[in-house]
From Swiss-Prot:
GO terms for molecular function: calcium ion binding; GTP binding; GTPase activity; structural constituent of cytoskeleton. Pfam families: Tubulin, Tubulin_C. The modification 5-glutamyl polyglutamate is found at E438. This is Tubulin beta-2 chain. It comes from Gallus gallus (Chicken).
Amino acid sequence: MREIVHIQAGQCGNQIGAKFWEVISDEHGIDPTGSYHGDSDLQLERINVYYNEATGNKYVPRAILVDLEPGTMDSVRSGPFGQIFRPDNFVFGQSGAGNNWAKGHYTEGAELVDSVLDVVRKESESCDCLQGFQLTHSLGGGTGSGMGTLLISKIREEYPDRIMNTFSVMPSPKVSDTVVEPYNATLSVHQLVENTDETYCIDNEALYDICFRTLKLTTPTYGDLNHLVSATMSGVTTCLRFPGQLNADLRKLAVNMVPFPRLHFFMPGFAPLTSRGSQQYRALTVPELTQQMFDSKNMMAACDPRHGRYLTVAAIFRGRMSMKEVDEQMLNVQNKNSSYFVEWIPNNVKTAVCDIPPRGLKMSATFIGNSTAIQELFKRISEQFTAMFRRKAFLHWYTGEGMDEMEFTEAESNMNDLVSEYQQYQDATADEQGEFEEEGEEDEA
């Protein structure tokens, strides 16, 4: 089997990670003690991707839980599925990172990283054929962002040919813990651009807007935001966890989704959007699902896809439905909105269907888009970064941990380069190839 090792780092990473395991354990019929009580062979067919089989038919998540302070992991341990995790896989410090990227990346995190790598090695050794790693973390804090990116680069060194996939929560002033989030996020993106193969950008701004506007929750809690995250994570990993043909492993997904190595930041979407504990009164039709899935209001990144173009798209439909209808609707979307898909990558939309719907829904659809509009998210963070950095505000917290201002400047320009690269491919057309021969005519244009 092709296994995935899951790592969750920091407070946010552990909270969304714990939710992810609750949701997928439920989908695979695994109870909180790790026993199987399911009703379908499909649930067990690819269970080994995310779970180890222990003695007594117990299924144990291939999960490593990391934090620089014990608090969040204690909550996970005492939470609904806390007993399913392997006790040795909790790795934590006592000092905390104090929302400081430098502490996570260079000082406190660097001291803990070797004990995490020991557990990573142990998990990888129990795999038959490891396909890669997935990390859940946020980019706004200290541990998930600083230590998370440190772990990525260390794992990259040791497993250069394995896929590195992240679920990265982007900070937003609407749901803010700290004022230095733009610093931490920019320093992290600087790392992610170079060291990951696939990054799902889960944007707190978008999650907040969905809760507030669509779900009409006046004061969304982290629990409400995380409900959306877990639905999305369950959706995008469906093809990895259930039998199917399309994007059935991390590498195939990367091959379909990433046309240029640096442009691997995906915009996830989900339909139908429901709030926690609400029941759906009627099942959506396939046309409604398709329409909602491509709607900017359903995107988990606060970017409007109509402001950019799709390089590639993957769609995952779940539930019992007609494949023919799904294909028709997906073609329909592309034909009606052809200007929003780059024409120089033909057939850049791929669709998968899985029979098992998520709990509480008859049908759902998950969207993964590699859109040039994701630059809006990076621009937003870059503007906030620049505002503080030009005054050198709060820098002493970072230089005090041994960082150099130069690293900030490099991170800033790397993120701005990323924005320009997205823009370049947004403007590119299919017939530009021939224009290089006619140098002379170019000047008049």
